[in-house]
Amino acid sequence: MSTDNKQSLPAITLAAIGVVYGDIGTSPLYTLRECLSGQFGFGVERDAVFGFLSLIFWLLIFVVSIKYLTFVMRADNAGEGGILTLMSLAGRNTSARTTSMLVIMGLIGGSFFYGEVVITPAISVMSAIEGLEIVAPQLDTWIVPLSIIVLTLLFMIQKHGTAMVGKLFAPIMLTWFLILAGLGLRSIIANPEVLHALNPMWAVHFFLEYKTVSFIALGAVVLSITGVEALYADMGHFGKFPIRLAWFTVVLPSLTLNYFGQGALLLKNPEAIKNPFFLLAPDWALIPLLIIAALATVIASQAVISGVFSLTRQAVRLGYLSPMRIIHTSEMESGQIYIPFVNWMLYVAVVIVIVSFEHSSNLAAAYGIAVTGTMVLTSILSTTVARQNWHWNKYFVALILIAFLCVDIPLFTANLDKLLSGGWLPLSLGTVMFIVMTTWKSERFRLLRRMHEHGNSLEAMIASLEKSPPVRVPGTAVYMSRAINVIPFALMHNLKHNKVLHERVILLTLRTEDAPYVHNVRRVQIEQLSPTFWRVVASYGWRETPNVEEVFHRCGLEGLSCRMMETSFFMSHESLILGKRPWYLRLRGKLYLLLQRNALRAPDQFEIPPNRVIELGTQVEI
């Protein structure tokens, strides 16, 4: 989305508020409550309140304002962000060994996101519904069922897209942030002493007074910055400037006022710790606040769901996940997609989490490990980009990295204390996704190498066919080829078994470039290899979906006329068997076979009419 048009800047900034800041914007529902709930051995004490408020404020300044908005967002790939984009950028100008390490870091970061995405909708919606405990305590047994009902409706509407309701996200979230600010300001006016916590010395004093316990307590403070990765991941939708403008003009002031307002309330009434957010509001405003809190958390959950759809598409297009059905829910916005398999797997996982943990406080114990782990990886990858791509001074880059890690590593280490109380959940889910992605990528590479290791020269084969042609039949045949200079398996098997060839043969390769989009001018490259053979290479970005009909249209513009319903598409279908392997590689091979069996078939991937496809099978040992 462009920000060149100044008249559209307010609208884009408002849209960014509605999408980008949903997760971090709903953190006040539970963050301070978890910090001062007594789990760390101290209750609502003045020094503890001031210490936590100071830590939260300066964490928002350093991590969000300085690290992500100022530094990390400089690293973009044609305007796009995200951990896999950062991985790609970092590996451009490094050695093969270093690139491999950076790829592993990027995949771990992406896997961590899958781990956290299960918790975010659950903790956000449950925190809002728990306002019932204040409004009507007798309804507290309905918190889990109502949370499941709300999220069920949210996941059910995904297939219809969010274009219509999405227009309401921005005004609702703007209203939410204004309410955060208003409630906080009202409380601060009644007890302005709390503003002393803006002094970072209160954070230092907190560590000196509470010593080891204060370090463990960082695991609760990190709840205030969950969702920070969304700022970078959504950069391509809104642009850097609108996201930064929204943060500094609306989001940061609102969050600061609300956190400090909760602190002022707790200094005056320590018993409000049971739910300091909702107790900020007067009695008459509790029900409206509960409703808009529920809406805000649904929007935050929607942003996370959309984020996992986008990450999955990117991973599929880059070859780290098996092909799956991706449905575009908007004709106007290519970023609005729906992936049925991911949607319902995520829904089942979220429901299981809600039923198992029962309360947002229990979920808070599971939150943070994956977030802070991703922060560490982002620091390393982004500073690598600064050194290798931007050619910044190595000592300056080292200082930046040290500064980032001095914050990231303590936060990550403190969250390891949550491992047994729930932190195992996102780590386990992330580990599973990492194994799946690395298995698909490595086994796919092994398969393609196996299929092509004994291949003959494409040029030599074409020359031989032109010199001693087989029986030629009228029409055009397209052979899908994964590599440009390799003879397609389907072509070899057609000649071997049918001993015929069409009058016109097109070898079509669809490849993904290291960019989000490819300009239409560069979409198709056509090369005539002989009087009857053509090579067509169609390039797509990882945010685009390949479409053979579009490729044919581009070919027609270049002089190679093709009609979809008059063309035969020949594809190979591999029947895979496992060869002799060590037990651990055999397990990985079995996982790959499972993924391969459930992968979307090529005709469905590229929107080729099924009645125009001929699949030729071949058995391959891996």
UniProtKB/Swiss-Prot annotation:
It holds the Pfam family K_trans. The chain crosses the membrane at residues 9-29, 49-69, 103-123, 137-157, 165-185, 213-233, 247-267, 276-296, 337-357, 363-383, 396-416, 419-439. It comes from the Bacteria. GO terms for biological process: cellular response to cesium ion; potassium ion transmembrane transport; potassium ion transport. Uptake is inhibited by protonophores such as carbonyl cyanide m-chlorophenylhydrazone (CCCP), but not by valinomycin. One of its GO terms (cellular component) is plasma membrane. InterPro entries: K+_transporter, K_trans_C, K_trans_N, Kup. Keywords: Cell inner membrane, Cell membrane, Ion transport, Membrane, Potassium, Potassium transport, Symport, Transmembrane, Transmembrane helix, Transport. GO terms for molecular function: potassium ion transmembrane transporter activity; potassium:proton symporter activity. Disruption phenotype: Deletion of the C-terminal 130 amino acid residues decreases both the affinity and the Vmax of the K(+)-uptake process by 1 order of magnitude. It is a multi-pass membrane protein. It is found in: Cell inner membrane. Residues 1-8, 70-102, 158-164, 234-246, 297-336, 384-395, 440-622 are cytoplasmic. It catalyses: K(+)(in) + H(+)(in) = K(+)(out) + H(+)(out). Residues 30-48, 124-136, 186-212, 268-275, 358-362, 417-418 are periplasmic. Its main location: membrane. Belongs to the HAK/KUP transporter (TC 2.A.72) family. Responsible for the low-affinity transport of potassium into the cell. Likely operates as a K(+):H(+) symporter. Kup is probably the major potassium uptake system upon hyper-osmotic stress at a low pH. Can also transport Cs(+) and Rb(+). In the absence of potassium, Kup-mediated Cs(+) uptake partially supports cell growth, however, at a much lower rate than with sufficient K(+). This effect depends on the maintenance of basal levels of intracellular K(+) by other K(+) uptake transporters. This is Low affinity potassium transport system protein Kup. It comes from Escherichia coli (strain K12).
